[in-house]
């Protein structure tokens, strides 16, 4: 994954920058007192962290070595062998489940959901971290009582899942004249 040069409001902008695990953990360390007082820590999220699984694993490991709590937000679309490498360094997995129907999931997201559902089961069965299922509630896709009930029933079959979070859908649209 490369740093991107983009046009933002007509101007060239560099979006993001390359960083090392050391640089990231030094930044994280600045808030250590806050993490200690609040019981918080770091959460890897935004985009799909498992697309950079080695970096994610190394950053989570560095945080755990320093006694910092760790969490990952992901839709679990990577092979389980990849996910398994981060589990020893993870306290909490915030896993997105968008739909229980593979065909509808594929129609909406471009990929079926069987791998993600199986990974949810494997993470739960591993017992290596706490697992919270999160559902972005999206109008006309999964906002029915039946679908939310189906996801809740699936989550209820996973050992150790104590919470299911329903997340409101945000549509950030703008028009230019």
Region spans (language model):
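Canonical Radical SAM [4Fe-4S] cluster-binding loop centered on the CxxxCxxC motif
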Residues: 1-17
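Conserved small/polar residues in nucleotide/adenosyl-binding loops
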Residues: 174-177
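Short, solvent-exposed beta-strand-terminating loops
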Residues: 168-172
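Conserved AdoMet/S-adenosylmethionine-binding subsite of the radical SAM
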Residues: 25-167
């Amino acid at each position: 994954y490369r740093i991107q040069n983009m046009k933002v409001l007509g101007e060239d902008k560099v979006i993001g920058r390359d960083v090392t695990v050391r640089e990231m953990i030094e930044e994280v360390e600045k808030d250590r007192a806050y993490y200690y007082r609040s019981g918080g820590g770091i959460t890897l999220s935004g985009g799909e962290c498992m697309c950079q699984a080695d970096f994610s694993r190394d950053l989570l490991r560095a945080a755990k070595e320093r006694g910092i709590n760790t969490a990952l937000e992901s839709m679990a679309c990577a092979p389980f062998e990849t996910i398994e490498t981060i589990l020893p360094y993870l306290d909490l997995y915030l896993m997105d489940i968008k739909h229980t129907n593979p065909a509808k999931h594929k129609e909406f997201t471009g990929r079926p959901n069987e791998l993600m559902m199986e990974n949810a089961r494997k993470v739960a069965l591993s017992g290596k971290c706490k697992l919270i299922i999160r559902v972005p509630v999206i109008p006309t896709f999964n906002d029915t009582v039946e679908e939310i009930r189906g996801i809740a029933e699936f989550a209820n079959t996973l050992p150790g899942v104590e919470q299911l979070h329903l997340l409101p859908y945000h549509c950030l649209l703008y028009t230019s004249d």
